[in-house]
């Protein structure tokens, strides 16, 4: 009905409203369904911090899982102290942003995909990571060094955002790459000084050790052939595979789109070529794909404009102040 009305009266934005409402309803219906131990780990770290302890040192004898996230995650979840609900809000914000932009294919995919719906409130924290990554990639297209800095900051939430730094080096040069490292150091260095680098590394190792069986990974696929797999072997393999992917793809990157795609490939190989992984790691890639898919695959000028086109006005203002740059070895900040 909304589609017929939009065709008859040129109210195409009704389709955006329908998709947005469907996305909200699906997420609301699934709220609290599913389980992730991420909220337990985050709350445990926040409780430790509130009591004057170290978020990267678990309480002896406690059943709370280790906290294998960056210091930005501590700051991000501290005010609400409710990671599940906070991630649900972020998921709604991402849906709102896509609807406001008006690209129908990306909005439809994000609003209705079972992956994004089911993981909006299961407790995993990859929606926040996805939004941080998307913002950084959008800034990167206009201000490479600032965007790379934001990539580094995103890596202080979840370290896997660093997957985009190798292609950034070959696209925008050493200055942008250094900005990315500086962004990562901005919070990781103080955290290492305050809470101890050895404690942080030990927490990451303890989090890996929790997973006793391969899951959603290359190791699981191999184990289905009745070949014995060991965690240590595949943990090393995924690092080698990720580094190899970066070395093979990054030197050929010459466009912003190339940075996005190469980073996604490095990210995917590094996270899924190991012993254990999770569907939640696909959320950042999915949000990035949903943002760019209409421009990449659809016919030109498919964006649906809201009355007065506020997104278009914002885009025009941004283009005048920060035009897109898309050439290899960019020297601009």
Predicted segments, located by residue:
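Primarily membrane-embedded glycan-assembly and transfer machineries that use lipid-linked glycans
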Residues: 1-137, 141, 145, 172-282, ...
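Transmembrane helices and adjacent periplasmic/lumenal helix-loop junctions
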Residues: 149-170, 273-281
């Amino acid at each position: 009905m909304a589609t017929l009305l939009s065709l008859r009266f040129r109210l195409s934005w009704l389709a955006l409203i329908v998709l947005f409402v469907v996305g909200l309803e699906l997420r609301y219906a699934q709220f609290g369904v599913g389980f992730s131990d991420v909220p337990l780990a985050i709350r445990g770290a926040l409780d430790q911090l509130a009591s004057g302890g170290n978020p990267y040192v678990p309480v002896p004898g406690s059943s709370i899982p280790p906290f294998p996230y960056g210091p930005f995650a501590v700051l991000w979840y501290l005010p609400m102290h409710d990671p599940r609900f906070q991630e649900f809000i972020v998921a709604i914000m991402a849906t709102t942003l896509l609807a406001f932009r008006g690209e129908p294919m990306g909005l439809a995919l994000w609003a209705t995909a079972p992956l994004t719906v089911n993981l909006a409130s299961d407790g995993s924290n990859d929606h926040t990571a996805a939004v941080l990554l998307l913002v950084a990639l959008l800034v990167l297209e206009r201000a490479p060094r600032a965007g790379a800095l934001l990539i580094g900051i995103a890596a202080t939430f979840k370290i896997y955002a660093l997957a985009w730094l190798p292609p950034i080096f070959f696209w925008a040069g050493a200055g942008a790459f250094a900005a990315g490292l500086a962004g990562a150091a901005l919070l990781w260095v103080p955290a290492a000084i305050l809470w101890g680098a050895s404690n942080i590394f030990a927490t990451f190792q303890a989090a890996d050790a929790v997973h006793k069986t391969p899951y959603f990974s290359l190791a699981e696929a191999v184990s289905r052939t009745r070949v014995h797999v060991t965690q240590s072997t595949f943990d090393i393999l995924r690092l080698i595979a990720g580094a190899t992917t970066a070395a093979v793809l990054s030197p050929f990157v010459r466009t912003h789109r190339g940075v996005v795609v190469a980073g996604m490939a490095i990210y995917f190989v590094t996270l899924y070529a190991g012993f254990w992984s999770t569907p939640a790691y696909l959320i950042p890639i999915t949000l990035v794909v949903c943002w760019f898919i209409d421009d990449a695959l659809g016919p030109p000028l498919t964006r649906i404009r809201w009355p007065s086109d506020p997104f278009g006005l914002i885009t025009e203002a941004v283009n005048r102040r920060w035009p897109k740059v898309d050439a290899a070895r960019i020297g601009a900040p």
